[in-house]
From Swiss-Prot:
The lineage of its organism: Eukaryota, Viridiplantae, Streptophyta, Embryophyta, Tracheophyta. HAMAP family: Ribosomal_uL14 (MF_01367). GO terms for cellular component: chloroplast; chloroplast stroma; chloroplast thylakoid; large ribosomal subunit. GO terms for biological process: translation. This is Large ribosomal subunit protein uL14c. Keywords: Chloroplast, Plastid, Ribonucleoprotein, Ribosomal protein, RNA-binding, rRNA-binding. Gene3D superfamilies: Ribosomal protein L14 (2.40.150.20). Binds to 23S rRNA. Part of the 50S ribosomal subunit. GO terms for molecular function: mRNA binding; rRNA binding; structural constituent of ribosome. The gene is rpl14. InterPro entries: Ribosomal_uL14, Ribosomal_uL14_bac-type, Ribosomal_uL14_CS, Ribosomal_uL14_sf. It comes from Arabidopsis thaliana (Mouse-ear cress).
Length: 122
């Protein structure tokens, strides 16, 4: 469960390393975001000499959370960190690689480009 002021790791090579959630895209007063939700975030830590800079406001999709994800068949998936992938306004990832495991629920949410870049889909 991601809420405003939550820090997230970046799971791609876009140039950002750490994000802080500002807002959850969707309903006007949504409290928490889960895997597959789009958030507005600010870059708190960035790699030098990359297109993304610190304090830049961007959009990102959440790909991993510490809070469990329950599936319809009864399985539960839990990750070790909270992570997101930086996206543009159309929903395409800004980076060319995605690091770490990605849940298959992102495919149903039309983030197929992120799923195709991922090394492992759970």
């Amino acid at each position: 469960m991601i809420q405003p002021q939550t820090y997230l790791n970046v799971a791609d090579n876009s140039g950002a390393r750490e994000l802080m959630c500002i807002r959850i895209i969707g309903a006007s007063n949504r409290r928490y975001a889960h895997i597959g939700d789009v958030i507005v975030a600010v870059i708190k830590e960035a790699i030098p000499n990359t297109p993304l800079e610190r304090s830049e406001v961007i959009r990102a999709v959440i790909v991993r959370t510490c809070k469990e994800l329950k599936r319809n068949n009864g399985t539960i998936i839990r990750y070790d960190d909270n992570a997101a992938v930086v996206i543009d306004q159309e929903g395409n990832p800004k980076g060319t690689r995605v690091f770490g495991a990605i849940p298959r629920e992102l495919r149903q949410l039309n983030f197929t480009k992120i799923v195709s870049l991922a090394p492992e889909v759970l």
